[in-house]
């Protein structure tokens, strides 16, 4: 059942007005080619100019600079230290040991930070790649069967899939659908291969032949898709535009419930922007998956707001035209009717750490990677963790694959009984297994933010470890040592850290200042509500102390923190985002 507006009288299907400049940019880009090749040859600047600054996103890159040294470089009359961040396309998050060793070496040899960053999009990122090494980076990925096509920009991005190593057969089929969806919705232009892999350009003039689904102007805004296997909502369906919820009978996949219109990004001070949970359109047999995916994407392509990019996501299109109208158009385009949704339930999120055995007899080891940062940390005493070296040593002997999770962790999957001991030994020797990690730390997550993200308003990744130290102490003081709160920090309101589905969500407002949101639930089916604005770091701890003390004293048996703050009247529940999220 929808918690949003199902019917809108006289819906506006097409938003009229002067289109955003990004629409001109895409139309003039020659199907995402632009003049990127020319920019690559320009060594007078380390960055990309004009339209190419935006266009490289559709090739999986963002132009960034090191913000820690930006001011000093300005004093020296130098341009910012431009570099790119690359996000790989990795449907379902699966990568094999050969591929891992290749990205490990590239990170060592050609990135400024020497790390591999696992992300909430179930893939990895390189940070700090300088212009002369960008083409080599893409060719390195290609040499091991990887790419970064459409992992950013106004396209369908990396397709997520539940990391479920136990239900091996079901997970395998769900993963295969994630891969099929990714391939089906990819841009068809050969721009990526021509620019980065030196493929010869083939001339064509028929726009529909080049981009039959995305169109010559691509999508109004980014579009995110997932495949999820209940009861674990590990990929946070309500953060995504399109979700296929696996329905099984007797352990076999029979089809999907289709959820449309989730999304978390917003803009501080703009009440026309808000996070929103997705609507359940109904059930489809699995053979209709690609047709429905294309129909949802093309409906959003044609009806999405190309005038105001802040209101261009699918969630706003649904609220503007009404869920029923959007759903009917999807059915018309696909030639398929949704049937009544099949029963399912999300009971939890997050990853289960340690060893599990799948029904295929293979063993799977889920490793907690704080903030997803795989690097050799050379701290004092017990703080030293050679995570990157450890992963390299495991990759050298591992015969299965690695599965990156949407919670920035990693599964060493498909381990035989005879290899379990050596895999665990390597993991422990290099700090990849730490039995002392608390439930609270495992329940906490942050986006990258400073020093690389140009949008960050406050710290996130660098702030979180110390914050969790303090929260652990607060919980223990309040008699909650064995409990945890889903805590997420994001450096800006764009939502990469999924703070808008946290029991406590901290959203950067300025240096050392955060807006504090409370009230999501354990299953991730509710967006939180603003509790306090512009809270400094000391204030954050003070509020968590007071709130957790009340939770400890007043909660019902087994009541989660997010449920408690709503029942206790600390914040109001957000039911309809458009109506409730900004309501004082």
UniProtKB/Swiss-Prot annotation:
The enzyme's E.C. designation: 1.8.1.2
Biological processes annotated in GO: cysteine biosynthetic process; hydrogen sulfide biosynthetic process; sulfate assimilation
GO CC, any one term: sulfite reductase complex (NADPH)
Sequence positions that bind [4Fe-4S] cluster: 447, 453, 492, 496
Cofactor list: siroheme; [4Fe-4S] cluster
Keywords associated with the record: 4Fe-4S, Amino-acid biosynthesis, Cysteine biosynthesis, Heme, Iron, Iron-sulfur, Metal-binding, NADP, Oxidoreductase
Binding annotation for siroheme: 496
Cofactor annotation remark: Binds 1 siroheme per subunit. Binds 1 [4Fe-4S] cluster per subunit.
InterPro entries attached to this UniProt entry: CysI, NiRdtase/SiRdtase_haem-b_fer, Nit/Sulf_reduc_fer-like_dom_sf, NO2/SO3_Rdtase_4Fe4S_dom, NO2/SO3_Rdtase_4Fe4S_prot, NO2/SO3_Rdtase_4Fe4S_sf, NO2/SO3_Rdtase_FeS/sirohaem_BS
Pathway the protein takes part in: Sulfur metabolism; hydrogen sulfide biosynthesis; hydrogen sulfide from sulfite (NADPH route): step 1/1
Pfam families named among the record's database cross-references: NIR_SIR, NIR_SIR_ferr
One function term, GO molecular function aspect: heme binding
Catalysed reactions listed for this entry: hydrogen sulfide + 3 NADP(+) + 3 H2O = sulfite + 3 NADPH + 4 H(+)
Enzyme class name: oxidoreductase
Known role: Component of the sulfite reductase complex that catalyzes the 6-electron reduction of sulfite to sulfide. This is one of several activities required for the biosynthesis of L-cysteine from sulfate.
Family: Belongs to the nitrite and sulfite reductase 4Fe-4S domain family.
Binding partners and assembly: Alpha(8)-beta(8). The alpha component is a flavoprotein, the beta component is a hemoprotein.
Record protein name field: Sulfite reductase [NADPH] hemoprotein beta-component
Natural source organism: Colwellia psychrerythraea (strain 34H / ATCC BAA-681)
